[in-house]
Amino acid sequence: MSENAANNIMETKICTDAIVSELQKKKVHLFYCLECEELARNIAAESDHITLQSINWRSFADGFPNLFINNAHDIRGQHVAFLASFSSPAVIFEQISVIYLLPRLFVASFTLVLPFFPTGSFERMEEEGDVATAFTMARIVSNIPISRGGPTSVVIYDIHALQERFYFADQVLPLFETGIPLLTKRLQQLPETEKVIVAFPDDGAWKRFHKLLDHYPTVVCTKVREGDKRIVRLKEGNPAGCHVVIVDDLVQSGGTLIECQKVLAAHGAVKVSAYVTHGVFPKSSWERFTHKKNGLEEAFAYFWITDSCPQTVKAIGNKAPFEVLSLAGSIADALQI
């Protein structure tokens, strides 16, 4: 057999395998909450096997939800998913009402995509009487009814504390994904002249992410108590002469990131950037980081977040130094598992 003939056979096999793989993908009907409409459309744009479906989100005069799932008969025997955003207690009840019903509509399988698990930072009971709402939320999600295909799959990105994966009961199948591949892809697009190293603002962030970023040199910061204050200090590593990227799972007020940036700059970092999967930013605290004359002008070269918190993405727009790295492609892939 000639070399050209062998190459043609190999190319034909590769094409055939690709076609078979594409045909084996399941068709998914994706419902979504109002906040997540843009992300849902981006997910559908990633795959021809994802079809968007709609829900009528209305309220009665007393404020309680008046909901209707369109095409309820058409999704029987189909793979169904729901894209949720538990951005506030006010919207959780209406979404849970839909989430509990969809698996009961005789669907082949049901997947809940909850990019941000909102109560994840409230997982500890430091004294008797503390309420660990992370466990409460996990119990609510764990009680989703099974579908004809079995337990519900729950897709969550970068849950705050690693032990929270054990909060979910056996009635659901949690799939814990991460946004770190989006960061590494973006870092590869930076100029080759920049020496990039990764900084973790505390030991918790190091535990969560260091294995995913072990091909980068690292710096670890820590918080130490001085009187009534908690001061950020450099624990290990040398940021001098480098573009340092602070990595964490979420940001609220941003105080820790700002203090960490000051410490890194004081130790000789040429640039400081930040990445968090979940830009929560309550009370518009993201404004502290925008490039303007407020004492923090361009303190951060880049601030990367994902679109796991749609309200934040909408508020920030394209304001520097923020860049949004979309989870759409990753979610589309997760829906095929």
UniProtKB/Swiss-Prot annotation:
Q: One Pfam family, short name please?
A: Pribosyltran
InterPro entries linked: Pribosyltran_N, PRibTrfase_dom, PRTase-like, Rib-P_diPkinase
Name the GO cellular-component terms: cytoplasm; cytosol; plasma membrane; plasmodesma
Q: List its EC numbers.
A: 2.7.6.1
Where along this sequence does the record place binding of Mg(2+)? 158, 160
Q: Which reaction does it catalyse?
A: D-ribose 5-phosphate + ATP = 5-phospho-alpha-D-ribose 1-diphosphate + AMP + H(+)
Q: Which GO terms describe its biological process?
A: nucleotide biosynthetic process
In its keyword annotation, does this UniProt entry include Cytoplasm? no
**Residue positions of the PTM N-acetylserine?**
2
The answer to keyword Lipoprotein applying to this record is: no
Q: A Gene Ontology MF term for this entry?
A: kinase activity
Q: Where is this region: Binding of phosphoribosylpyrophosphate?
A: 241-256
Q: What class of enzyme is it?
A: transferase
**Where does the source fall among the domains of life?**
Eukaryota
The alphabetized UniProt keywords are: Acetylation, ATP-binding, Kinase, Magnesium, Metal-binding, Nucleotide biosynthesis, Nucleotide-binding, Transferase
What the record says about family reads: Belongs to the ribose-phosphate pyrophosphokinase family.
* Protein name as catalogued: Ribose-phosphate pyrophosphokinase 4
